[in-house]
């Protein structure tokens, strides 16, 4: 279907349509786009005009196509001449806006045919058909002549992009540029643009902004363009918006109802009038002053020049004072009357904004932006609203010495006094100004904004110095509550969610927000300025940006945090990469469009930067090259100079640059780590050969056997794992990883010796020469405060090495006895004398983190103890703790020695806080034994020492001044909640301790918020209560605390409703096990639905969080099998006024499916009565034989077998997918609603993608569909020729049956009786008897009719009729079975006199 414009003449295009479909290359490039948008916030309408300058790549250019989705094309002009020959083909509107009753695919099909519907939309397919694309096709008039012209001569006429200049064959000459103008209109957009006008009575909170969550599928919803990342051009954006908030939805044309006096009275605020009047008053004052001075000229001793200087200074001071007074008055007016606030346009390159009055409408203004650097349409963004704006203060400009305290104090004073002036003054310098925009709400005040974003200035300054110049002139950030993802990256603009902001009293988001802001700024260099040529090249851009984030983390937070993050990222990759495809081919066969919101790129963001890190380590270690510090600036320089074609980066080009810098081939590295999946798992054996004086190492790769062992579902849940399995059944695992590795051996002289070895096979045997010539003695313990570390004596004595030790706390006998600790020098469960015979202290494999791997080394436990205490490297300490954790978990060892080592590690404040957390987590892995004094008891003692009153479980008043201790305080209860005894239950000791912490928590004297801490405590207490929910006494205490904190948050709301939503979900969990009567569920749902966004008691983010939590509980509490609940859910999904809730609702559905599949809770939910009855009828219809009847009646007997099969199926992802499909295939209401929703035009592109992906997992898609056709007429028209007379021909047309059935007449044969025979007289001799001849009578054959048998049915009871069995016997008998809906009762036989019942007990069912 094609939709034509009003005056279109499609004949000229239809004949050539086949040519358009066969075009497989672009025959033009876009050089420049000028977009004019008139935005109406009140009606959600945008009137746009796009002026596009294209450069033909062929001379006979006949047609051009642009991506246009969900917009109405009003007019098209080519070279300022109207063009009626265009076609706007929008399948999305054509297929979804029509009547669904007339849709052949919709009528008689269901959700199993959803993939046919998906194939109709190009954005949802990897290789879409041409007729499924939403395109505007324009015919270039034949009157326009295209010829080659000089490119330099045309550079003044149109800004040709670098992609054109650097394209081979187009350097000296280009074809004649063509200018097209497209007029269009957008109403109520669903994707690409988001209107937020939910506050009907607060128009100053209305806003509209662009969204690019779906890559290369967002910009075409609001501007005609070629929506590809490599189609870059320069831009000019012109916005027509209301001048003030009160002008929204109004219009006042010039000359209407009076002249401009009306404008001054009604539309211009008072301060504008004052501004116009003040210069005149100043001039008059100057004249008076000059007259007085002329009169007294002879009396004054000053010269004329000095007087003039004094006057200028006084005038400048007075102007500044007047401006400050005007700003103050204006701020007061805006605070008193928000409708007087200015409407602000935030766009790229805000430093060159031009604000002009509207030419015809007095209530509007025009804002014009220019983007000189070529940018793809996907990265053009803007936001409009009555925003507050702040300029970030400058932290340390390059000209100021950071060590000079005096100058730094002066600079700080100047920055505080003149924040806005510094931005204007430094635009031309190396400082990149950053502007922040937020809505005028109480939650986003100046302190909150500056506290969260002040680090951005230092981040962007570090990037520009280390990796190359910032590609734009400025940067702005807009924080909005409805942004679908944490940050959306545009050219010189970032649109972020307000959840990244945090006030001064919240410290939990400090690290996460800083990391997200660092990513947003790094993406400006890589992902915006430099883009991938193909989707599978995205790993390069994300890897570069992530590597930049690593370096700025090292700069801002220190080397320990940097190394700890690297090690944790490596462990996370090992945990997740058992089911992931290679990052170099992730998007081959994957779901489209690629979305930031659905975390399609999350694993690449994790792994790609680590690959660049290990590549950098190998390059700098083996070849002594500069590594990534030379590669990245070289790529950025190529992008700025035009040497990188179209600023599009490919994997092959990135590999080529790395090889040029490294001066060697890296093909094996890229094949193993980029184009292969998985990570190595290394098992290392070591032995010292005293005869040869070498250390013999054996390194074996065992990832084929151990990677993903006993893992079914990844970190992101069942839905993501299932989708990855369906999209990438072949993971292309790397069998053997190769490359260099650094081995560090700490020998007895205290010196670490490094050895670089090469791994070339799955098993590598290495001999490392021993270096120490003389035997050293080692002084154990002590030395914690010795900074020199090594003592050298001139005497001829054995060298004694004094080693600085960590963990040397709680060493006195009293402390060891009180806390059940072993001696500090005892570090092994084996014989301590063995340590004296060892050739080295400890050995580290891959000491420089050149491999992303999991390592197992068979060195003794005392070596790991030395490594933990004496090696200052964070990675070494973490490896040692992982060893103890592995021994406790897999070895089942209850070692007090190991527990004491972990205790001292966790309690020693000199350790990095991440190491202390890891030690606490390792202690929680001990299986609880009342007779064992270590493990869990040590973990409780750590919390008591740090945070409780002496010898009690009552915590001290909270004090979060020390962030390191705060993270310990938050995480130790989480680790305690995981503790189990031998029976898999949580010990009473732990349960009571966690409850005491929650009961006696006190935050009155703390200046920081404890909302996140209380939320964590509630989650942990509920978790241990669910572990043994039959403990009614403990359960009552838990419910009492839930009620207490619920009342508290009702009086004093928590930050983003963290505590309230946690209590809601806790109640659902308790109700699920029968420990809580969830009677208020209905009231809670109704309260949340009727609360409305306009409620001023809570923030917007709090309302959104509460609403989504209620929606989640409703679905889990039976809503997935309740038609009314599903109808409510789909209405929210499609029609809720908050776009954030609409987008996140589909994520809630996916999360609920994850939960019910993993815990099997859907089986405990009863279906609707109507759907249950319908399913019974369907089963009865399928009964065809006696075997089917017996199978139907004995269906409940197969439950045991079903449980066994399900248990086997849960051991792999394929079995889980089948279990999921079995759960949902029989419930028709959900299938019908999902099918109806997919056929509605109200969904956004993200929602449509997510539902299609979810359906692909939940149901088996069938490659056939039902089509209903009209019944053909019984008669058809036929023509017969009759020629009765010569020369005359009659043609008779009449209707004749289509099928002629010739039925033969019945032949009834009647047999006549033969005639009577003539009597023959025979005379015989003698008196003998005469024999008579019998008559031959032939009777006709008569078919006997079937005899009717009367029968009746005796029915027992009122249950639904399930089975009727009729037996044909001499005496007809009818047997009935009336089976109730129970798996324990079965009526096997019923007659008129008796019936048989079979009853099973629960014990029988289990057996």
Swiss-Prot record:
One of its GO terms (cellular component) is nucleus. It is found in: Nucleus. Its main location: nucleus. The modification Phosphothreonine is found at residues 158, 161. The modification Phosphoserine is found at residues 163, 318. Signal peptide: none annotated. Residues 277-307 have a biased composition (Basic and acidic residues). The keyword Transcription applies. Pfam families: TAF2_3rd. Belongs to the TAF2 family. Present with 1200 molecules/cell in log phase SD medium. This is Transcription initiation factor TFIID subunit 2. It comes from Saccharomyces cerevisiae (strain ATCC 204508 / S288c) (Baker's yeast). The lineage of its organism: Eukaryota, Fungi, Dikarya, Ascomycota, Saccharomycotina.
């Amino acid at each position: 279907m094609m939709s034509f414009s009003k005056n279109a003449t499609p004949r000229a295009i239809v004949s050539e349509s086949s040519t358009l479909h066969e075009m497989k290359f672009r025959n033009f490039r876009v050089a420049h786009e000028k977009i004019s948008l008139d935005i109406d916030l009140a009606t959600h309408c945008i009137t746009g005009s796009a002026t596009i300058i294209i450069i033909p790549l062929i001379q006979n250019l006949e047609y051009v196509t642009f991506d246009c989705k969900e917009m109405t094309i009003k007019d098209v002009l080519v070279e300022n001449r109207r063009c009626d020959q265009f076609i706007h083909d929008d399948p999305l509107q054509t297929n979804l806006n029509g009547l669904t009753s007339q849709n052949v695919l919709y009528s008689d099909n269901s959700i199993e045919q959803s993939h046919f519907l998906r194939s109709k939309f190009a954005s949802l397919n990897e290789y879409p058909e041409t007729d499924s694309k939403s395109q505007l096709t324009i015919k270039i008039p034949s009157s326009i002549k295209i010829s080659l012209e000089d490119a330099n001569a045309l550079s003044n006429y149109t800004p040709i992009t670098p992609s054109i200049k650097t394209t081979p064959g187009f350097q000296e000459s280009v074809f004649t540029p063509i200018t097209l103008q497209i007029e269009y209109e957008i109403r109520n957009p669903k994707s690409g643009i988001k209107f937020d006008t939910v506050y009907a009575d607060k128009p100053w909170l209305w806003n509209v902004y662009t969204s690019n969550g779906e890559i290369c599928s967002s910009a075409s919803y609001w501007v005609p363009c070629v929506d590809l990342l490599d189609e870059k051009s320069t831009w000019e954006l012109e916005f027509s918006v209301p001048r003030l908030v009160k002008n929204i939805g109004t219009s006042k044309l010039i000359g209407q109802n009076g002249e401009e006096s009306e404008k001054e009275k009604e539309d211009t605020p008072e301060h504008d009038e004052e501004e116009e009047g003040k210069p005149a008053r100043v001039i008059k004052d100057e004249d008076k002053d000059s007259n007085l001075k002329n009169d007294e000229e002879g009396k004054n001793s000053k010269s004329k020049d000095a007087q003039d200087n004094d006057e200028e200074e006084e005038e400048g001071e007075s102007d500044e004072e007047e401006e400050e007074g005007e700003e103050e008055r204006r701020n007061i007016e805006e605070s008193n009357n928000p409708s007087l606030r200015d409407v602000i346009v935030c766009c790229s390159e805000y430093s060159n904004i031009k604000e002009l009055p509207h030419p015809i409408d007095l209530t509007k203004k025009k804002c014009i932006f220019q983007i000189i650097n070529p940018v793809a349409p996907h990265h053009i963004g803007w936001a409009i609203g009555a925003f507050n704006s702040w300029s970030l203060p400058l932290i340390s400009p390059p000209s100021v010495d950071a060590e000079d305290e005096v100058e730094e104090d002066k600079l700080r004073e100047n920055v505080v006094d003149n924040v806005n002036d510094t931005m204007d003054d430094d635009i031309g310098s190396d400082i990149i100004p950053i502007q922040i925009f937020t809505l005028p709400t109480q939650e986003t005040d100046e302190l909150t904004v500056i506290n969260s974003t002040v680090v951005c200035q230092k981040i962007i300054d570090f990037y520009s110095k280390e990796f190359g110049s910032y590609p734009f002139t400025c940067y702005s950030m807009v924080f909005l509550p409805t942004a679908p993802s944490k940050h959306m990256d545009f050219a010189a603009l970032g649109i972020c969610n307000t959840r990244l902001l945090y006030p001064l009293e919240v410290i939990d988001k400090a690290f996460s927000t800083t990391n997200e802001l660092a990513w947003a700024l790094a993406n400006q260099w890589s992902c915006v300025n430099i883009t991938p040529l193909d989707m599978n090249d995205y790993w390069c851009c994300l890897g570069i940006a992530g590597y930049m984030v690593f370096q700025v983390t090292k700069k801002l937070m220190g080397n320990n945090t940097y190394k700890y993050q690297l090690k944790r990222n490596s462990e996370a990759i090992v945990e997740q990469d058992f089911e992931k495809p290679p990052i170099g081919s992730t998007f081959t066969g994957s779901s489209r469009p690629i979305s930031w919101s659905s975390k399609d790129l999350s694993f690449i963001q994790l792994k790609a930067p680590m690959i660049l890190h290990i590549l950098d380590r190998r390059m700098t270690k083996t070849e002594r090259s500069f590594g990534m510090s030379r590669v990245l600036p070289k790529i950025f320089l190529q992008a700025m100079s035009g040497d990188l074609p179209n600023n599009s980066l490919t994997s092959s080009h990135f590999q080529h640059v790395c090889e040029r810098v490294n001066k060697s081939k890296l093909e094996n590295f890229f094949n193993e780590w980029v184009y292969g999946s998985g990570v190595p798992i290394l098992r290392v054996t070591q032995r010292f050969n005293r005869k040869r004086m070498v250390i013999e190492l054996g390194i074996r790769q065992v990832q084929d056997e151990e990677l993903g062992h006993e893992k079914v579902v990844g970190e992101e849940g069942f839905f993501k794992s299932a989708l990855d399995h369906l999209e990438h059944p072949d993971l292309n695992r790397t069998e053997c990883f190769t490359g260099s590795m650094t081995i560090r051996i700490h020998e007895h002289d205290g010196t670490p010796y490094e050895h670089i070895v090469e791994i070339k096979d799955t098993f590598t045997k290495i001999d490392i020469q021993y270096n120490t010539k003389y035997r050293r003695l080692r002084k154990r313990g002590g030395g914690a405060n010795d900074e020199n570390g090594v003592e050298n004596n001139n005497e001829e004595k054995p060298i004694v090495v004094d080693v600085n030790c960590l963990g040397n706390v709680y060493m006195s006998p009293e402390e060891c006895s009180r806390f059940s600790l072993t001696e500090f020098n005892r570090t092994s469960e084996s014989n301590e004398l063995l340590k004296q015979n060892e050739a080295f202290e400890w050995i580290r494999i891959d000491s420089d983190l050149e491999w992303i791997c999991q390592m197992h080394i068979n060195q003794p436990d005392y070596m790991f103890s030395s490594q933990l205490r004496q090696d200052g490297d964070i990675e070494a300490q973490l490896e040692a703790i992982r060893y103890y954790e592995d021994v406790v978990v897999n070895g089942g060892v209850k070692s007090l020695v190991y527990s004491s080592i972990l205790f001292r590690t966790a309690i020693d404040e000199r350790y990095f806080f991440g190491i202390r957390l890891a030690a606490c987590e390792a202690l929680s892995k001990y299986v609880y034994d009342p007779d064992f004094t270590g493990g869990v008891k040590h973990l409780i003692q750590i919390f008591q020492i740090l945070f409780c009153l002496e010898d009690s479980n009552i915590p001290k008043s909270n004090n979060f001044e020390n962030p390191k201790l705060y993270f310990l305080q938050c995480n130790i209860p989480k680790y305690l909640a995981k503790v189990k005894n031998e029976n898999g239950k949580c010990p009473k000791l732990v349960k009571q301790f966690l409850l005491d912490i929650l009961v006696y928590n006190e935050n009155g004297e703390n200046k920081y918020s404890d909302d996140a801490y209380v939320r964590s405590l509630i989650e942990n207490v509920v978790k241990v209560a669910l572990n043994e929910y039959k403990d009614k006494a403990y359960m009552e205490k838990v419910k009492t605390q839930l009620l207490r904190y619920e009342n508290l948050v009702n009086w004093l709301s928590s930050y983003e409703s963290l505590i309230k939503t946690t209590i809601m979900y806790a109640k659902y969990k308790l109700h699920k096990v029968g420990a809580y009567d969830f009677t208020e569920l209905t009231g809670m749902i109704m309260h949340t639905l009727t609360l409305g966004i306009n409620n001023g008691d809570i923030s917007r983010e709090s309302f959104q969080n509460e609403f989504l939590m209620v929606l989640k509980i409703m679905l889990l509490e039976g809503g997935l099998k309740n038609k009314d609940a599903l109808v409510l859910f789909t209405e929210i999904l499609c029609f809720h006024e908050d776009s954030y809730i609409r987008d996140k609702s589909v994520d809630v559905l996916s999360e609920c499916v994850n939960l019910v599949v993993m815990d099997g809770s859907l089986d405990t939910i009863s279906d609707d009565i109507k759907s249950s009855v319908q399913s019974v009828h369907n089963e009865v219809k399928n009964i065809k034989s006696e075997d089917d009847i017996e199978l139907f009646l004995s269906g409940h007997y197969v439950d045991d077998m079903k449980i066994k099969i399900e248990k086997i199926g849960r051991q792999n992802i394929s079995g889980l997918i089948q279990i999921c499909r079995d759960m949902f295939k029989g419930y028709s209401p959900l299938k019908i609603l999902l099918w109806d929703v997919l056929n509605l035009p109200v969904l956004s592109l993200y929602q449509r993608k997510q539902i299609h992906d979810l359906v692909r997992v939940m149901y088996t898609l069938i490659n056939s569909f039902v089509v209903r056709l009209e019944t053909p007429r019984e008669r058809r028209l036929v023509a017969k020729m009759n020629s009765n007379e010569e020369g005359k021909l009659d043609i008779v047309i009449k209707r004749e049956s289509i099928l002629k059935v010739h039925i033969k007449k019945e032949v009834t044969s009647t047999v006549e009786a033969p005639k009577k025979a003539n009597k023959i007289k025979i005379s015989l001799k003698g008196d003998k008897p005469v024999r008579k001849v019998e008559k031959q009578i032939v009777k006709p054959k008569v078919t006997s009719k079937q005899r009717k048998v009367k029968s009746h049915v005796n029915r027992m009871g009122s249950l639904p009729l399930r089975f009727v069995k009729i037996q044909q016997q001499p005496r007809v008998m009818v047997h009935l079975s009336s089976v109730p809906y129970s798996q324990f009762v079965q009526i096997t036989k019923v007659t008129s006199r008796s019936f048989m019942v079979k009853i099973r007990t629960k014990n029988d069912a289990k057996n």
